[in-house]
Amino acid sequence: MTKDILILAVETSCDETSVSVIKNGRDILSNTVLSQIESHKRFGGVVPEVASRHHVEGITTTINEALVDADVSMEDIDAIAVTEGPGLIGALLIGVNAAKALAFAYDKPLIPVHHIAGHIYANHIEDLLTFPLIALIVSGGHTELVYMKDHLTFEVIGETRDDAVGEAYDKVARTIGLNYPGGPQVDRLAAEGEDTYSFPRVWLDKDSYDFSFSGLKSAVINQLHNQRQKNIPIIEANVATSFQNSVVEVLTFKAIQACKEYGVQRLIVAGGVASNKGLRQSLADQCKVNDIQLTIPSPKLCTDNAAMIGVAGHYLYQQGRFADLGLNGHSNIDLEEYSAE
């Protein structure tokens, strides 16, 4: 009988302290998440120093809870996986140092994991990844299209040239007057409104898979500013609907076109914005029309969590891609450089 592989995974790249135990690359034995949303809400966004302080306060408890929930001990664990980047450097270092301490104390291999690779592998938990595939990455810090021909091979074929889609959502939400985190609230409002504004769709160069959302963001901000200056009533739901339709149309079109050009019949979506209902429905509709298999994780697996890090860590473990105790956190890591090829 093949021995089960247990990975203890740590994720502290931004404002969630999360620890998970993953068995054999898919089974979640535990996935403890300590959220900081309430602490950052009054600031209208994540404050790095506050995030780091909360990670320091919560990391030990979160590790212990994950082990208890999984009903395992550190002696049962085969390796420690940890997000090394990208992310907030102070936050990353809390998780990296905790993982290094565990690896040293219990003599376990240490596995560095790229945060975006983790988001991609969140899909594998509920629906086995099959290759080749196109991954659409949509989050607060990233908007990318990635071609994968096998496990841990990443070719970035498109990325944002300015704002990430999640960043645009948060800025538009603040302009409308919605509380942090704004993305889910814009999505909720968008379901109630009508597309009454002609906000731009930015396609960039012909056949380009890059994205740009700064122009759209500015168009929304300027529109609301002009209406307020002229005392013209603002129907917030209509603003949200018009903005979201512009975003979703571009994301959907480019993702489907990438699948067609690369001859791929599998599209996966990853990142916090993957929980957006408007985007999920648009992609589902177009994938059905184009006979493309679509996988989007459950909303709880779209946001930052350690389970996704553990799944990616499992495949890195199988490839023997370990780090020594000199491992550091990195605010920026190129996904292609992290690729197995």
Swiss-Prot record:
Its EC number is 2.3.1.234. GO terms for molecular function: iron ion binding; N(6)-L-threonylcarbamoyladenine synthase activity. It comes from the Bacteria. Substrate binds at I137, V138, S139, G140, G141, D170, G183, D187, N276. Fe cation binds at H115, H119, D304. PROSITE patterns: GLYCOPROTEASE. One of its GO terms (cellular component) is cytoplasm. It is found in: Cytoplasm. Binds 1 Fe(2+) ion per subunit. The gene is tsaD. The lineage of its organism: Bacteria, Bacillati, Bacillota, Bacilli, Bacillales. GO terms for biological process: tRNA threonylcarbamoyladenosine modification. Pfam families: TsaD. Transmembrane segments: none annotated. Keywords: Acyltransferase, Cytoplasm, Iron, Metal-binding, Transferase, tRNA processing. InterPro entries: ATPase_NBD (IPR043129), Gcp-like_dom (IPR000905), KAE1/TsaD (IPR017861), Peptidase_M22_CS (IPR017860), TsaD (IPR022450). It catalyses: L-threonylcarbamoyladenylate + adenosine(37) in tRNA = N(6)-L-threonylcarbamoyladenosine(37) in tRNA + AMP + H(+). Belongs to the KAE1 / TsaD family. Its cofactor is Fe(2+). Required for the formation of a threonylcarbamoyl group on adenosine at position 37 (t(6)A37) in tRNAs that read codons beginning with adenine. Is involved in the transfer of the threonylcarbamoyl moiety of threonylcarbamoyl-AMP (TC-AMP) to the N6 group of A37, together with TsaE and TsaB. TsaD likely plays a direct catalytic role in this reaction. This is tRNA N6-adenosine threonylcarbamoyltransferase. It comes from Staphylococcus aureus (strain bovine RF122 / ET3-1). PANTHER family: TRNA N6-ADENOSINE THREONYLCARBAMOYLTRANSFERASE (PTHR11735), TRNA N6-ADENOSINE THREONYLCARBAMOYLTRANSFERASE, MITOCHONDRIAL (PTHR11735:SF6). SUPFAM superfamilies: Actin-like ATPase domain.
